[in-house]
Amino acid sequence: VLVNGNKVKAGYNLKLGDEIDLKSVVEKVLSSKPQDIPIDIVYQDKDIAVINKSQGMVVHPAVSNYDGTLVNALMFNLDNLSSINGVIRPGIVHRLDKDTSGLLVVAKNDQAHVSLSEQIANKTCKRIYWAIVEGVVKSNGEIITQIGRDPKNRLKMAVLESGKGKTAHTIFRVIKTWDKYSLVEFELKTGRTHQIRVHSAYMHHPIVGDKLYNPNKCKFNLNGQLLHAKKLTLIHPTTHKEMTFECNLPDYFERVINILDNSK
């Protein structure tokens, strides 16, 4: 990043009239190339692909993450991707956080992209997640709040007062409970950034392993939150038939379940 034609340190305070040049950053992002990165392709045809994303993989290139993203892998492994989101996010209709694993649908052409985006906007695309959270969740329920950027920490999202954020709607169902933990199914009715992570923390049941929203020390030696996009239902853009995809929990997720099942 150049300011008035000169390189500056990260802590430089901008002044009125400063000219900022981001050309070098943009060029580096746009120069991302296909990379031979193995990915789990659950399904694909000429219109869509459904991917089981692994934990730790960023979905698309951005500043500080130019390589090793899902987009780099998609560019190598698929024959075509939609262009609606440009060269930085080809094919990407919705996202999963870096440390959230599971199912994600990709558009292979622009017609499919429009259809899938409309389904998400109209809430006809059903997205089901499983998570292990702290504490015993006693009943099923739903959370409807406003979510926006946390005014105290710009890296986080937060529940805000009415009118200060965007509406976020999550339905949750208790699958199993242990002494101090619960396995919970979450259904997204909206798709706000970090929505499930924020809502679970808001109900005082933060997700195990969530380094951003869970202040408690994790006891299970994890690399990230135990949040997995387990089930995805959509209408195929061309055939107009309903399709449902489901994937197994990752090994590290199953490991924690086994530990809890065998704990006294």
Where are these regions (language model features)?
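RNA pseudouridine synthases
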Residues: 1-264
